[in-house]
């Protein structure tokens, strides 16, 4: 289903919002896994599936979002950041967000999201650079601490841990879903079970 800025533009005026530079699509975990299995063989020439772990063989981190990229496009110049990510992020793309189930208990829901934030913070150690200026002081301090810890954990392991955390409740019945591969400041967004299962 359409999501985020793409959904806003579609509902508001039937087009793109001016400040958005990509397309956003959300899947339940089950549908996402099916999509990534068939997409490589079904995407047209010039488009490809880019998983986060495909960049530099999973040794670096940008985020946990899988994308469909349009290879015949360039968005940025040949910058140091683009070279760090092998030029794979220098394209027009479709973000593929994953909806996973959250435990119904307040403590279980909090713990799932908290652990995702910890893994994301540790993964930031494997980015091309860290810009703490965009965070408030407490968040900047915690991000710095986590990124120092992340220096001692291989990024490939963090990718596996994040995937396990995201899907650990997928077989359980629950009333809420969340965006498990989105950035931490949006983990507060949850969706009702009926909305996800009826729409997707």
Predicted feature locations:
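A short secondary-structure junction signal
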Residues: 106-112
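C-terminal helical/coil "lid" or tail adjacent to the Rossmann-like core of SAM-dependent
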Residues: 116-118
């Amino acid at each position: 289903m359409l999501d985020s800025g793409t959904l806003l533009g579609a509902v508001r005026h039937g087009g793109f919002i001016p400040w958005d530079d990509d397309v956003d699509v959300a899947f339940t975990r089950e549908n996402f896994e099916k999509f990534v299995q068939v997409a490589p063989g079904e995407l047209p020439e010039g488009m490809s599936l880019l998983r986060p772990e495909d960049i530099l063989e999973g040794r670096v981190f940008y985020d946990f979002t899988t994308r469909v990229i349009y290879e015949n496009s360039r968005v940025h110049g040949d910058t140091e950041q683009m070279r760090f990510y092998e030029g794979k992020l220098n394209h027009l793309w479709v973000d593929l967000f994953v909806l996973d189930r959250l435990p119904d208990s307040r403590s279980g829901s909090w713990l799932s999201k908290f652990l995702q934030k910890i893994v994301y913070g540790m993964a930031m150690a494997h980015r091309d650079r860290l810009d703490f200026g965009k965070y408030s002081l407490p968040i900047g301090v915690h991000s710095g601490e986590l990124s120092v810890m992340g220096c001692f954990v291989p990024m490939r392991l963090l990718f596996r841990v994040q995937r396990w955390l995201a899907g650990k409740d997928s077989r359980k019945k629950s009333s809420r879903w969340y965006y498990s591969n989105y950035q931490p400041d949006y983990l507060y967004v949850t969706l009702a079970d009926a909305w996800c299962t009826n729409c997707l």
